[in-house]
């Protein structure tokens, strides 16, 4: 059985006059024609505007004002209609989303009183659907937190700007339904590349500059200490004379001024340490000079060795050439020598020897020719 409208709506229809019932009848016919064409698949925002009605397609529906049956309940009698309509509506086809069969995909039954009495939804409330409840805190927190974490100096102005933006969003929700520009990238991140190096640069330079500044103080510490000690003991001459004067001049200087035992001990200590320092400097200087001289001598000897090696190679090559030439000369001479029988001498059995006067003799190998005057 089809659902019926509530009792309040039915009583409201009973109290209407005849003229008002005629106007409601026309309005209801227009609504039914629109729902039959569109299949009642409209969105959740109903729009019932009488200025643009759909064309009239056929005879009007039954005279009932609700999806109930034609016979009303016994407890709620209805007045007779002002005019009679055809009882049979068999010539009008029943669409799939017909009103009589209630094949309408809605959550509550449709009634004339309900449609007319139900107020339209507020457009601002519709725009608020999907927005998170509560104040827009996530948009303000990233800016203020990131500014503090990155040592950004303008964190207070960013916080005020985020508060002002939240107030505007609450006032003008219809103009700015969803805002993301401030949450995508905080403004402090754009300045992080410039603020971090400026803060780290002095820290990186301080350790390196400290030892460099302390070196001149360490070098002049001994001299300044001797000067302070001499000034405290009231020595009447500077420390440069104590260290640099020769022995005779230094003794004359001490004899010229009457000094106490403590002053003499201090002067001799300053001279001893100054002389040791000068001697150490001279020793280092002599060592450096000796090292430089040895390096130069080593370089000279290396060059001389290379020259001698080249000369030895040339001498070996010359000696080899002379041996080859001597062998060829032996072969040539023995080819021209003949004995009484006309036979040639063998180089393996005979050898050529030269006397002191330059005469050359042919002698058997293994014998030596005695020198003759």
Curated annotation (Swiss-Prot):
Chain positions covered by the region annotation Leucine-zipper: 291-298
A GO term for molecular function: sequence-specific double-stranded DNA binding
Motif (PXY motif 2): 79-83
Superkingdom assignment: Eukaryota
Region annotated Disordered, chain positions: 127-150, 205-226
Keyword Transcription: yes
CDD domains in the cross-refs: bZIP_NFE2-like
A Pfam family recorded for this sequence: bZIP_Maf
Domain statement: The PXY motifs are required for binding WW domains. PXY1 is required to promote transactivation of beta-globin and for hyperacetylation of histone H3, but not for binding to the HS2 promoter site.
Role noted for this protein: Component of the NF-E2 complex essential for regulating erythroid and megakaryocytic maturation and differentiation. Binds to the hypersensitive site 2 (HS2) of the beta-globin control region (LCR). This subunit (NFE2) recognizes the TCAT/C sequence of the AP-1-like core palindrome present in a number of erythroid and megakaryocytic gene promoters. Requires MAFK or other small MAF proteins for binding to the NF-E2 motif. May play a role in all aspects of hemoglobin production from globin and heme synthesis to procurement of iron.
Protein's name according to its UniProt entry: Transcription factor NF-E2 45 kDa subunit
Species this protein is from: Homo sapiens (Human)
């Amino acid at each position: 059985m089809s659902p019926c409208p509530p009792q309040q709506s039915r009583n409201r229809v009973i109290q209407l006059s005849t003229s008002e019932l005629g106007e409601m009848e026309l309005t209801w016919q227009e609504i039914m024609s629109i729902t039959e064409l569109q299949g009642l698949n409209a969105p959740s925002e109903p729009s019932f505007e009488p200025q643009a009605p759909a064309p009239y397609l056929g005879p009007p529906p039954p005279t009932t004002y609700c999806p109930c049956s034609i016979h009303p309940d016994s407890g709620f009698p209805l007045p007779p209609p002002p005019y009679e309509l055809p009882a049979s509506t068999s010539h009008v086809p029943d669409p799939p989303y017909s009103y009589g069969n209630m094949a309408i995909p809605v959550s509550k039954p449709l009634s004339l009183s309900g449609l007319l009495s139900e107020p339209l939804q507020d457009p601002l409330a519709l725009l608020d659907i999907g927005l998170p409840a509560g104040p827009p805190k996530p948009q303000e927190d990233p800016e203020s937190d990131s500014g503090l974490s990155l040592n950004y100096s303008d964190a207070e102005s960013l916080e005020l700007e985020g508060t002002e933006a939240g107030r505007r969003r609450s006032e003008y929700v219809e103009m700015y339904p969803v805002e993301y520009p401030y949450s995508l990238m905080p403004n402090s991140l754009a300045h992080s590349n410039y603020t971090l190096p400026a803060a780290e640069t002095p820290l990186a330079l301080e350790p390196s500059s400290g030892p460099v500044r302390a070196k001149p103080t360490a070098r002049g510490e001994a001299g300044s200490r001797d000067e302070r000690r001499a000034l405290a003991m009231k020595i009447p001459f500077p420390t440069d004379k104590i260290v640099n004067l020769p022995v005779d001049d230094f003794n004359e200087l001490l004899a010229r001024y009457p000094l106490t035992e403590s002053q003499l001990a201090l002067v001799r200590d300053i001279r001893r340490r100054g002389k040791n320092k000068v001697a150490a400097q001279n020793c280092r200087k002599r060592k450096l000079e000796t090292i430089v001289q040895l390096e130069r001598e080593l370089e000279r000897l290396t060059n001389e060795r290379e020259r001698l090696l080249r000369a030895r190679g040339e001498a070996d090559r010359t000696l080899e050439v002379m041996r080859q030439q001597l062998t060829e000369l032996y072969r040539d001479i023995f080819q021209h020598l003949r004995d009484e029988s006309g036979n040639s001498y063998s180089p393996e059995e005979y050898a050529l020897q030269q006397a002191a006067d330059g005469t050359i003799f042919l002698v058997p190998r293994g014998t030596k020719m005695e020198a003759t005057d």
